[in-house]
Amino acid sequence: MARERLYRMTEIQRNMLVVALMDEYRKQKARGVPYPPIGRLAVRAEDAPRHKHRLPWDKERLYDLYLNDAEWRMARDALNALRSWRFSVGKGDGGTDDALLRVMSAKYKKAPER
């Protein structure tokens, strides 16, 4: 078992991550330098398994996504670019900040085999 960062995200944060990664993928594809790992990470984030709650009153849907260091950097950079874009157009950024904070504070855990 490898040690990877566990990004435990809500459904909204998962959607933000997928949108941010797909935006980065489209930008790189438009430049003529597609980077397939970004697309694969977006698909993995979309298909992330639900977190198993230990207590019955935990109602918030959480999803577990294990990230190696390169994937963690891609997720961090993509969410930061989305946050910067939202600042530039004057939209609220509270949700993007929460998603970025959760990615930055992801701890190393024993990841299951892929």
Spans of features found by a protein language model:
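Positively charged, low-complexity terminal tracts
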Residues: 1-114
